[in-house]
Amino acid sequence: MNWRSEHIWIEFITGSRKTSNFGWACILFLGSLGFLVVGASSYLGRNLISVFPSQQIVFFPQGIVMSFYGIAGLFISSYLWCTISWNVGSGYDRFDRKEGIVCIFRWGFPGINRRIFLRFFIRDIQSIRIEVKEGLYSRRVLYMEIRGQGAIPLTRTDENLTPREIEQKAADSAYFLRVPIEVF
């Protein structure tokens, strides 16, 4: 979702609350819970899951390994659920031509640097840069080149934009900010 007027352009960034992250977190949680239950049933010698008898899986070494995979999967799943609940990576890009200021805001992990806020003048923007990496896993990323600060990404690195979409986004940004476009 974007909001745009004659002098101000605000672009909202999704962050980690994407459908794919919800899907992976659910699959990982259920799979690791299954591994942990199988490991526990082999330790107890009882059928906690009626799919197969617990005598088929000996606790040492199969049950221990299944329990370890289950615990590791629960840790990774909890990490994913935390990033989803904290909405890490979400925020906005605000371009204000009237004030001559660009503000980039992102939510990070809890702590001292939870709020990531970058602010600089439009006159310090050298160009809008498109970085294209072709191959099996092609990647197209849009950067804003800032004098003295380097390049700041405007699109997510995992966002799979088509060449037409990335060109349109770069053209819109460059036109609004009145800066040139570079392609690498």
Curated annotation (Swiss-Prot):
This is Photosystem I assembly protein Ycf4. One of its GO terms (cellular component) is chloroplast thylakoid membrane. GO terms for biological process: photosynthesis. It comes from the Eukaryota. Coiled coil: none annotated. Seems to be required for the assembly of the photosystem I complex. The gene is ycf4. The keyword Protein biosynthesis does not apply. The chain crosses the membrane at residues 22-42, 57-77. Belongs to the Ycf4 family.
